[in-house]
Amino acid sequence: MKFNGSFLYLLQKLTFNLVDLISPLEYKEFVLDSLKLANQSLEQDSKICPDLLYSRLENVDEKDILTFMELDKETNPLVWSCIANYFALICYHSYQQSGEKYLPQTIESVDEGTIEAYVSSYKQLIADNNQLVQQLSALDFEPILNDPLVDNYFGDLLQEIKLKQ
C-alpha cells in the first residue's frame, strides 16, 4: 500500500481538526505533540525514526495513543479511532520510507481496512458535529480533489462536508 502527498496532506488536515474534541487536557496535549511529530516525519529530509513515531502510538510505558483511547471515557471513541488509525497509517508510511523489513505487529496489520475505518469513523463524527463541519469547511481541499487516491478513499466524505456547508 502506497500513499502520495495529497493523501497524507488530507489525513493531516482532517486529523488535526479532531484534537479539540479530546476532553482530558493531558491527552489533548500528548496527541497534539504526536501529530506535530508525525507532520515533521513527512517532511522530505526528515530524520525522525519510525520507531519514535510508533512509540507515540503504542509503548510499554502506557503513555501512548492506544492507552489513552482505552482510558478516556469522556471523549467520543470515534475521535480516538480516527487518531489511532491516522497514526498507524503514518507509522506504516514512515516504516515503508525507511525500508524497514520488520514491522511492529500493530503496524504490520495496517491495510486498506485501516483507511476505511478512518473514513467511516470520520463520517459518523461529521454527522453529529456542526462545529467540526465548520472547521473543515474553512479548509481548501480543491488542490487535492482530482487526486485518484484521495477521491477513491475520501471522495464521499469530502462531498458530505461540502453538502453540510
Locate each region found by the language model:
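Structured binding/interaction patches within domain cores
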Residues: M1-Q131, L145
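Charge-dense, extended regions
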Residues: S121-L125, N129-Q165
